[in-house]
């Protein structure tokens, strides 16, 4: 486990790719947040005698529901994209957020790149063993023409994910003590998150409803152009673009 974490996440592979000017992103999904006038941990400065009022109990409100922020953090440029989902936290949602990062930020910064490194947890919406996860990066490869190298953190090491402390920890500080009254408020708070080192965040709502329980046919899995690493190939693999596919 230590070899995996120090050798891949913080050492040789990202450093090598960064030295070549290739993109390295760390992706993760923040916990779902209730949308509405609910108490939020922490505090903020308010005029004396005018505290923000919030109910003592939190229940999901019809028509508002929950928000699931999924982030892609560009390790080299200290900037990130966040898609705020309004449905299930699925593999399709994760891949959609990765595509949004590429379309909105990555393409302009890494035009002509031949490979992308994605560092992520081994569970949640991007599990290494998930059949639903891998067709997504394959479609991304076919469309972008890049190889996508995926490195999943092994169980018990999710705190090594850079998206957690570089991005989501800062977002939590930004909205502490603030009721997340609407999706617009959530997007505004996330997009205005910054740090003393110059973190830049862009954000948008993903309005698509993602369904759970979707099955991937064996034929679709067999069509994925994947090369697994000798060391824990279920965690480390490269997906390549297929010739002739858009």
Each model region followed by its residue ranges:
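Charge-mixed, compositionally biased segments that are often intrinsically disordered regulatory tracts
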Residues: 12-52
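Extended hydrophobic secondary-structure segments that form protein cores and membrane-embedded regions
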Residues: 25-26, 115-122, 150-155, 189-190
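RNase H-like two-metal-ion nuclease catalytic core shared by retroviral integrases
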Residues: 128, 150-172
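Two-metal-ion acidic nuclease core segments, chiefly of the RNase H-like superfamily
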Residues: 133-149
